[in-house]
């Protein structure tokens, strides 16, 4: 895609033309983050890992903010938001009945089938605010697993030996307050267990005030095994360390939702451009935010 092409102009117009006006249903703190639930008329179902552009109806900010879709039930969409700047602070301060401009869902998400249809185990690795996309991913994995493996033997992929999917969720936080952001994910994990997934959640807290001082990478080193399929989201240094661990094991595939600043959200401004391992450029908002680990970090 070249700068100044008609495609970039059309993408920018699409973002402005397809804004939806949502109404805040609930906004509750979860540690250092806010769980914002919005009713969005016209919302199209999101893939896990996709995001939306959000802007408070009365915002003083020029640009909307890119926020991962954390969960959805029809037009009721939940977001986990960290107040890191003026725009996100405005979103975290909204009350029931306030209005929000929404564009989305946008981007490319996780490959649910690759995580579910596998001889290995599914592993979710999240650091800090990187927990945000995983409630929806876990819910969709449970739904897809039921659809595939609740059929009689011979009518679909898998069989008796694939009737239970093991999912290991590894979470890392600076302290116990930040760890409260995992509340929604834990709720979804409990429901996933009831639906037939064998789901286990482990949490590493770095400050060591309520147990051993550990990072999420310590948990991954302890538990990762050959054949695992891994979904990752977190700060770049954590993602790089996770990839190094994954690359050290045979037959491990990992998908990374990259944390990077976005402006337009539709690929027209090239503000989130990254260079991939093969030397080509990619727009995180359009070509991602989810990429295979080897594409980003190299083989």
Label each residue range with its predicted role.
Residues 89-261:
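FNR/FR-type flavoprotein reductase catalytic core
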């Amino acid at each position: 895609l070249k700068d100044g092409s008609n495609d970039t102009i059309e993408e920018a117009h699409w973002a402005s033309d397809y804004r939806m006006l949502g109404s805040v249903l609930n906004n509750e703190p979860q540690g250092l983050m806010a769980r914002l639930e919005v009713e969005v008329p016209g919302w199209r179902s999101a893939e896990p890992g996709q995001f939306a552009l959000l802007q408070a109806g009365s915002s003083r900010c020029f640009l909307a903010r890119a926020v991962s879709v954390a969960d959805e039930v029809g037009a009721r969409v939940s977001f986990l938001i960290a107040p890191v700047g003026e725009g996100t602070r405005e979103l975290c301060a909204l009350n029931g009945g306030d209005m929000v401009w929404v564009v989305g869902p946008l981007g490319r998400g996780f490959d649910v089938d690759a995580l579910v249809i596998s001889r290995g185990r599914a592993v979710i690795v999240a650091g800090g605010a990187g927990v945000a996309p995983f409630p929806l991913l876990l819910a969709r994995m449970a739904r897809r697993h039921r659809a595939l493996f609740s059929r009689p033997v011979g009518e679909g992929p898998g069989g008796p030996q694939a009737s239970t999917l093991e999912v290991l969720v590894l979470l890392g936080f600076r302290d116990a307050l930040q760890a409260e952001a995992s509340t929604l994910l834990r709720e979804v994990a409990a429901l996933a267990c009831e639906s037939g997934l064998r789901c286990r959640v482990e949490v590493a807290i770095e400050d060591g005030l309520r147990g051993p001082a550990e990072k999420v990478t310590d948990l991954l080193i302890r538990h990762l095994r050959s054949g695992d399929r891994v979904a990752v989201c977190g700060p770049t240094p954590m993602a790089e360390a996770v990839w190094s661990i994954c690359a050290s094991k045979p037959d491990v595939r990992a998908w990374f939702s990259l944390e990077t600043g976005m402006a337009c959200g539709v690929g027209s401004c090239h503000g989130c451009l990254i260079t991939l391992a093969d030397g080509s450029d990619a727009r995180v908002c359009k070509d991602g935010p989810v990429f295979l680990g080897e594409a980003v970090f190299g083989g």
